[in-house]
């Protein structure tokens, strides 16, 4: 089997909280790739059902009956400690626990899964979607993250890419990607704001674009605000209304909650286009008096009232972003709306009130981020020329110094990549070591900021307090991921770390997860192969029985008996749930005997041609196409020119090569 050439394309993936999307550059244009289910976006949902792992639409379809094993909105947990996500935990039906180092883990059937592993399953789906379209393996990607993701969340997203078998060439913020998609063909200089309200996060970025240069001036946001929160206010309202009507609390019923979640999302979407919507959930629960039905009417005005606090929370980040960019609202030429929640009329009114202008609705809020990621992939791959992206870090980075103070080395909204150095010293006489505690945030005291890493610089030569010269260097790469080093000038001793963050995965954990992903890939392949073999065997039995029924009067009785025996043999291996090879062998043996029908029929036709009376006596007039239908083989013989069989074999071979090919 020849080894398939890997694609030179760097795909762009928008790994969203609610939905994900994949795009690729083709002929100088970014193209969104349609999934195997025929959709341009895929639900970011992973479910475990028996021995199967379901991703996307199949996972979403069974969520109501399998809520505790269906993992949705897991992006809200990636790169975070369990203690940081208490509000999010209350909104999901699956079990969220604290791992050995305080990380978030999900518990399903007694097994722990990290957010990175679940994200990797969605990324694998995106990767396979691109591979099916391009017809060759894909190994490189640009993945987007919310602009206000901190260092550990970015690093964890990159780790998810590695687990999925992707070399993540760049992590870029979602608003920046949207700006790339918007401005790639625009002439002249513009200052734009990107208002990105997605399923789990809110970002606002201010950019200056012109002559192919995309410079981020500032960014702000709220990683605890998104469409899920808008769903939640509707869910709470439905629970309260139902309790008033029936005296039953649905908040403890996971299956009912999943139905309410689906109903809330549907109502929210409908209210962007209509002024009121009916919510009907028959048989939502039951008590001693019988089944209970939930029937409510929600108006747009009441929904906006329920969500007023959430809408208000989008304003302050916008004002801060403008202030950091040293601009006023009147300086902004255009406001882009990104994320599904930006379709809500009340959100658009908030944007209009902040910036004093109608927002631009010319981009598809669900696809624009993936398109921008593909453009960045094109820039990195040399396919897109004369584009320069200057991004910034969203939060200040520094270290803890004497008195528990946060001393920033890199201020927020600093353009990246960048390197900053600063000299520090010891706090005590003859201090032999220092602990470098790396922080991210805007608060003056260390304890109020997020600790994203720590390491020790040891064997400092004895010296009075304040004498040792310890140079701390912060090096931030284009992905916004931090590398820190500390060097003692006297001894030349140096210590370096890549900030994996206190809630980042260690290298051995990543390797284990990569291996697990490969193992599941193999298991899924075997399950699919078994399913295909059983389906083919069933189909073969049907064809064989139909052929006997149609032609038994025109073929030898001994052949009929042989075929019936082979049919029974195939039935037996199916009933016994025999291994795939046994099923295939039995099917192929039946197929070989079915081909004898064709031979017998051709012989019969030859005899009929010799005597014109044969047709008058009712002998069938058989054509070649009829024979082909009934002599179908699970594997076409060498040299078979039937295009359908030939194509099927080529497809199957390509699939095997893609699945088996080791990740680079």
Swiss-Prot record:
Keywords on record: ATP-binding, Chaperone, Nucleotide-binding, Phosphoprotein, Stress response
Residues the record lists as Phosphothreonine modifications: 201
Residue ranges, annotated region (Disordered): 516-538, 578-664
Pfam families: HSP70
GO molecular function: ATP binding; ATP-dependent protein folding chaperone; unfolded protein binding
NCBIfam families named in the record: PRK00290.1 (NF001413), prok_dnaK (TIGR02350)
Family named by the database record: Belongs to the heat shock protein 70 family.
Name recorded for this polypeptide: Chaperone protein DnaK
Gene that encodes the chain: dnaK
